[in-house]
Amino acid sequence: MAYNAVEMADWQISEAAEENMPTPEQWAEKLGLQSDEMLPMGRLAKVDFLKIIDRLKDRPDGKYIEVTAITPTPLGEGKSTTSVGLMEGLGMRGKNVGGALRQPSGGPTMNVKGTAAGGGNSLLIPMTEFSLGLTGDINDIMNAHNLGMVAMTARMQHERNYNDEQLQRLTGMRRLDIDPTRVEFGWIIDFCAQALRNIVIGLGGRFDGYTMQSKFGIAVGSELMAILAVATDLADLKERINNITVAFDKSGKPVTCGDLEVGNAMAAFMRNTINPTLMCTAEYQPCFVHAGPFANIAVGQSSIIADRVGLKLFDYHVTESGFAADIGFEKFWNVKCRFSGLKPHVSVLTSTIRALKMHGGGPKVVAGKALDDAYTKENLELVEKGCENMVHMIGVIRKAGINPVVCINRFYTDTDAECAIVRKAAEAAGARCAESKHWEKGGEGALEFADAVIEACEEGNDFDFLYPLEMKLRDRVNKIATEVYGADGVDWAPEAAAKAEMLESDPKYADFATMMVKTHLSLSHDPVKKGVPKGWRLPIRDVLIYSGAKFLCPCAGTISLMPGTGSNPAFRRIDVDPATGKVSGLF
């Protein structure tokens, strides 16, 4: 039975649902897991993925369902809520269903956006643990990452203080000769802290470190988080960590975590991080939570490991891609599925009347400010014009050979006439379409949606990648820009073109993934341009190299790995009851 999502806050719904939440022992029985495959951690548990996958290696995989979205408003269009709602709807239909979602960062949770647990009757529980650190994965990543910085800055200090003979005699280390102006790594913290974007470290005497400019980034922007999302096992994780480039020496050669002899210790911090955490929906469908990388510089997905486990345990496995189909889905399609070898059956395109109205020329949507009446009152013209963005995204999904299902994530202000326009446009573009009221009604409100996905899963598809790995970097970027974003072409800055040419000539980078860096608020590089922009070219100003994750990131704009905290952050409304320890105010 659904809770009253209009009157109850998300944290209140979670608290009520938690009263009947299965224990780790009950989950082991429900999922058919053996005792040594569950690693209990309080009310939650991690699972030993290697043992499960090895035991079930001969079991056929379930149906693989990805959830993406049209280009969103700054408010987001409810992909996580839709993912959870689909699990609940499939559960209501009696299906063996589960999923895998990303772990949220403490930064957005305490800032304007809030947590990523879903919402209303379609959320993950227990919400407090989910929102406030879960089973410690992000903390482990922070310790591992910052240990790398400690190793590098200490090494720079010792190399400054000792000559080559002293360095060898006292420490047994060779001189790395790191260039302080070419340090790639920074420190990380799991908050939005704009005051830490640019800092100076090492002030004091010769034993107080190496004086230089440095920086902090948000924890989920760490290359370690990206590695966690794509690693296949602990050996792969350790190898990738040792290959991370932390800086360049004064001759221009990369300096890695392996060179600093710190990579293995960093991997030791993440020995448990590699195992997914088991949670559930408010209606008690199981869901793994694992990894949480940015979708702008990284893959923007939960982990390959969680998907591999879920596909063995569930007949229907639901996962979510960050941002919209042009970014998150494109990386799911051409990176995650290529790395994993898994082939999806269905992609759900989350659509809202609100976002379609914005793309149709509606007033500007600003996070933290009241919506214009155009978004809460019927306006068929705006919806019809805005459907162009949805139709474009359907085309992107179909280009991958995956069966698309449009989910109208229906709000109470949406009208039947508005939804009818969306359905007509979606079906004309070759997609199934279903309305869903999962936020309000949980699984019961997602039955039409679940049925559409079940039907789509039974249809054959012709999944294939957009480009072969043999294709050169600049050709890949041009193909993504023209066939996914709708650009007329690509303009490379001279420095970026030179770097791309160097990377294309070095066979070491041939199998690196192409990880585009672009705004999520537009199909173009300009967040102001809505709908489906015409007559534009994609500018590439730089190419970032993530040698551990094996990503090459062409940048179509500036990025900051440290968001800022807004003027009305969520932490102002979060509290804890001293008598019970229960947390209130999360959303």
Swiss-Prot record:
> Which InterPro entries does UniProt cross-reference here?
Formate_THF_ligase, P-loop_NTPase
EC numbers listed for it are 6.3.4.3
UniProt GO molecular function:
ATP binding; formate-tetrahydrofolate ligase activity
Q: Which UniProt keywords apply?
A: ATP-binding, Ligase, Nucleotide-binding, One-carbon metabolism
User: What are the binding positions for ATP in this chain?
Assistant: T73, P74, L75, G76, E77, G78, K79, S80
Superkingdom in the source lineage: Bacteria
User: Does Nucleotide-binding show up as a keyword for this record?
Assistant: yes
Q: In which pathway does it act?
A: One-carbon metabolism; tetrahydrofolate interconversion
Against SUPFAM superfamilies, the record matches this protein to: P-loop containing nucleoside triphosphate hydrolases
The cysteines covalently paired via disulfide bonds are none
**Could you tell me what reaction this enzyme catalyses?**
(6S)-5,6,7,8-tetrahydrofolate + formate + ATP = (6R)-10-formyltetrahydrofolate + ADP + phosphate
Q: Which GO terms describe its biological process?
A: tetrahydrofolate interconversion
Q: Which family does it belong to?
A: Belongs to the formate--tetrahydrofolate ligase family.
Query: NCBIfam families from the xrefs?
Result: PRK13507.1
Q: By what name is this protein known?
A: Formate--tetrahydrofolate ligase
Q: Which gene encodes it?
A: fhs
